[in-house]
Each structure stands twice: as C-alpha cells, then as structure tokens.
A protein has these predicted regions:
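Short beta-strand edge/turn micro-motifs at domain boundaries
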Residues: 39, 207-231
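Membrane-interface motif at the C-terminal end of an N-terminal transmembrane signal
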Residues: 24-38
Length: 231
C-alpha cells in the first residue's frame, strides 16, 4: 500500500510539472502573433520579450516608443536617456551607473557621450556629482507591442513586432488604436488582454511593424538596430 501511494504521488508530481510547463507556454506565447518556425524555445522567447520591453517606451515622451536606427550610436539622444531612466530605478544615479547600464542594454560598442549636465531626462547635481531623474508625464494610451515572428541566426535574433496603442480614457472600455490613433477595435474593461491581442492579430495590416535586431554578447542580448517593415 505504501509503495502504491509513493507511485501515485510520483505520477501526480509529473502531471503537475507538465501542466505547469503548458501554463508557462500559454503565458509566453500569448504575446506571439505568429509562432516562430526557427526552433526558438520558450526561454528564448521570454528573454527576447523582456529585452524589447526594456527599450520600448512611450511616444508622448520620445515621439516614438521605439525609433528606427541603423546603429544605436545614431539613435535619438532623448530616447537613449529615457531608456536608461526606465532601467535604472533609483532617485540618485551616478555617472558610472549611466555608462554601465548603457553597455548592458546597447553593448560595448556604444560610444555615446553622457555629459555631466542636466537635460530633459535628468537633472544634474554638481555638488553631489549625481543625476536625478525628471518626472515622466504619460497620457491614457499605453504603447504596446506583440512579437509576430522570430528568426534565429548564428549571432542572435531578428524579431518582428506589431505596434499598437491601448486607449484607457474611457473607464468602461479599452479602445485599440494604431500609431496614428485610428480606432481598430474595442473591448470592455472587464475583458482580458488576450482579447485585445486577438483583435490586433485579426487586423495586422492596419498596424505599424518593425524588425528589432538583437545580438548575443557576454551572455546577454543587446540591441543592434531597429528598422521599419514596409508592406
């Protein structure tokens, strides 16, 4: 009887592990508009989504949540500073932290100068030799992306994303808009995020699409360039 009980417990444990794996897959793949056909596993997808989320901002602050650039050193100064601010969750930031975070996100080849002076993103305290982040004022439209495809190559990934806005100005509903703020669809505020993504997937041609080039460097992913996908 004891042996049978142990066997049953082992079987139940296996079932729980399998179900947990399925649940994790569902959570991650719900942000995929199209499943990748390039042998990209769940862990890779999670890391890719986390990386792009770190650099995906707010168009009311930086004009574009994710601007195009052929080389990160040519990306707009404001966007780079705001990416750093988003990823350094501190009220007082040292120069070394600014430089280190920039390399963690954009790689060792970034050669942007970070002058010790104030700008739109940071105030600079000369006496303390620190940067102090300025406040960010956001509107009621959330800038969002979903991954539509991932191409895995020897050095990293080419990731295609679809960009859209979730308008929360009405408490009773969420309006899905493209980047020119044209209404594409709407859901009630009680409906899940999955329903919103279904609407986006059904209207892919009406949204902006970009390709994000990610490179593997020092056991992390760094952003190389971003291009617009032309229809």
């Amino acid at each position: 009887m004891l042996k049978w009980g142990k066997t049953l417990m082992k079987k139940m444990l296996i079932i729980i592990v399998v179900l947990a794996g399925i649940l994790i897959s569902m959570i991650i793949y719900k942000n995929m508009a199209v499943s990748s056909k390039n042998n990209v596993n769940i862990q890779e997808i999670k890391k890719i989504e986390e990386k792009i989320s770190k650099i995906y901002l707010w168009k009311e602050v930086t004009n574009e949540a994710l601007p195009e650039f052929e080389n990160v050193n040519n990306a707009t100064e404001l966007w780079i500073w705001e990416v750093l601010k988003k990823n350094i969750d501190k009220f007082e930031v040292s120069y070394d932290e600014i430089v280190q975070t920039s390399k963690e996100i954009f790689g060792q080849n970034i050669n942007k100068e970070f002058p010790k002076s104030g700008n739109v993103s940071y105030k600079y305290d000369v006496e303390k030799d620190i940067y102090i982040p300025t406040e960010v004022t956001l509107d009621q439209m959330e800038d969002v992306f979903i991954i539509s495809d991932i191409h895995k190559n020897e050095g990293g990934y080419e990731v295609e994303i679809i960009e859209y806005l979730e308008d929360y100005s009405n408490e009773q509903k969420v309006v899905i808009r493209n980047l020119v703020e044209e209404e594409i669809g709407q859901v009630s505020s009680s409906e899940s995020e999955t329903k919103i993504k279904e609407i986006v997937k059904e209207n892919v041609s009406r949204f902006n699409k970009k390709k994000v080039f990610l490179k593997k460097e020092d056991n992390r992913l760094i952003v190389q360039k971003v291009t617009k996908i032309q229809e």
